[in-house]
Amino acid sequence: MPILPGMYSAVTEIAAADPDSALEHFERLFSFETDCWDVHAAIEAGHSDFVLLDVRSPEAYAAAHVPTAINLPHGRINEHNLAQFPSEKLFVVYCSGPQCNGADRAAVRLARMGRKVKKMIGGVEGWRDEGFSFATQEQLS
């Protein structure tokens, strides 16, 4: 259906937030998310100020994962499995990509346990799209 002059497109049918609200919203996102570039830069610089969790299956992790990541599927996140990490440590979680809600499920579990958490947006797909290399289970052996 063509857009007639004076009609709104689906983009503008709902008004955009005012700039102050938009600023508050987008600034808050940085408290919840990080991206593949920032994680890669931190790994390359040798930073250890966060724990990177691959929350996919052990099989997916073994095939390819982000270097330095620890495999802990989101369904296995519990106090016992986190006991080795200081309570103030930040966790950065990722899964397959935008089509997967495993990272969100992991973030909910961690937050419910009082742990600090961010999601690495893009997940494995984002990491691959940026051209970053992966580690495999064979490399760990």
Identify what each model region corresponds to:
Residues 66-68, 106-109, 132-134:
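Short, glycine/charged-enriched secondary-structure capping and boundary segments
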Residues 70, 88, 134-138:
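Short, hinge-like loop/turn segments at secondary-structure boundaries
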Residues 46-52, 67-68, 90, 116:
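Short active-site oxyanion
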Residues 61-67, 127:
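Short loop/helix-cap segments at secondary-structure boundaries that form the rim of catalytic
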Residues 82-128:
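Catalytic cysteine-centered active loop of the rhodanese-like fold, especially the PTP/DSP P-loop
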Residues 72-75, 121, 138:
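Short beta->alpha connector loops at strand-helix junctions that form conserved
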Residues 1-52, 56-63, 136-141:
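Flexible, polar/low-complexity N-terminal or interdomain linker segments that lie immediately upstream
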Residues 76-81:
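Alpha-helical scaffolding within the catalytic cores
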